């Protein structure tokens, strides 16, 4: 899979979660901040990243840099996705279903951020299992990676799109 150059895209960033984490040392606890950020151009490109630092702004900056390295392309048909898909990550699972125009993004918290920044404006989703932000974001990204356009499937099967769709 070719890497997507983030400099050619107008990316929008959204901080999904900031978490205070602690390392216990002899003299007490050392606190740091972990940030989870989703970036996307609202036109079929989306990515997520995590960053950890002593201060919140530094953690967010690191997460944004990481997210720009992990961009994926999402096939969009009109305002929705081409077909139903289930994304998995750890104990987190998300069902993504195409929706008719005007439905809007029906998704909870972290998944909503990913879907909106990918440029999908009509979709139904249901999260099952683990609902931690990182698991939900990774499961959503996994689901979006599985999506294929009708042309791609037809080419893989050696058929025409008309034969495929009946």
UniProtKB/Swiss-Prot annotation:
What's one GO MF term for it? Answer: rRNA binding
Give the highest taxon in the source lineage: Bacteria
In the record, the note on similarity to other proteins reads: Belongs to the universal ribosomal protein uS5 family.
Question: What region holds the S5 DRBM domain?
Answer: 11-74
Q: Which cysteines are joined by disulfide bonds?
A: none
Its name, as the record gives it, is Small ribosomal subunit protein uS5
**GO terms, biological process:** translation
Record the organism.
Answer: Anoxybacillus flavithermus (strain DSM 21510 / WK1)
What does this gene product do? With S4 and S12 plays an important role in translational accuracy. Located at the back of the 30S subunit body where it stabilizes the conformation of the head with respect to the body.
Q: Which PANTHER family match?
A: MITOCHONDRIAL RIBOSOMAL PROTEIN S5
Cellular component terms (Gene Ontology): small ribosomal subunit
Q: Which key words tag this protein in UniProt?
A: Ribonucleoprotein, Ribosomal protein, RNA-binding, rRNA-binding
Free-text comment about domains:
The N-terminal domain interacts with the head of the 30S subunit; the C-terminal domain interacts with the body and contacts protein S4. The interaction surface between S4 and S5 is involved in control of translational fidelity.
Pfam families in the cross-refs: Ribosomal_S5, Ribosomal_S5_C
Its subunit composition reads: Part of the 30S ribosomal subunit. Contacts proteins S4 and S8.
């Amino acid at each position: 899979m070719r890497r997507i150059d983030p400099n050619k895209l107008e990316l929008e960033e959204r901080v999904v979660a900031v978490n205070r984490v602690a390392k216990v040392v002899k003299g007490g606890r050392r606190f740091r901040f972990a940030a989870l950020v989703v970036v996307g151009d609202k036109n079929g490109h989306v990515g997520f990243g995590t960053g950890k630092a002593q201060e919140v702004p530094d953690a967010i900056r690191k997460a944004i840099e990481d997210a720009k390295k992990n961009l994926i392309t999402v096939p969009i048909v009109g305002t929705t996705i081409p077909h139903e898909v289930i994304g998995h990550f750890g104990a987190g699972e998300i069902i993504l279903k195409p929706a008719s125009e005007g439905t809007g993004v029906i998704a909870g918290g972290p998944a909503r951020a990913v879907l909106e920044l990918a440029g999908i404006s009509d979709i139904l989703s249901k999260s099952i299992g683990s609902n931690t932000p990182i698991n939900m974001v990774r499961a959503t990204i996994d689901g979006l990676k599985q999506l294929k356009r009708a042309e791609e499937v037809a080419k893989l099967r050696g058929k025409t799109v008309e034969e495929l769709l009946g």
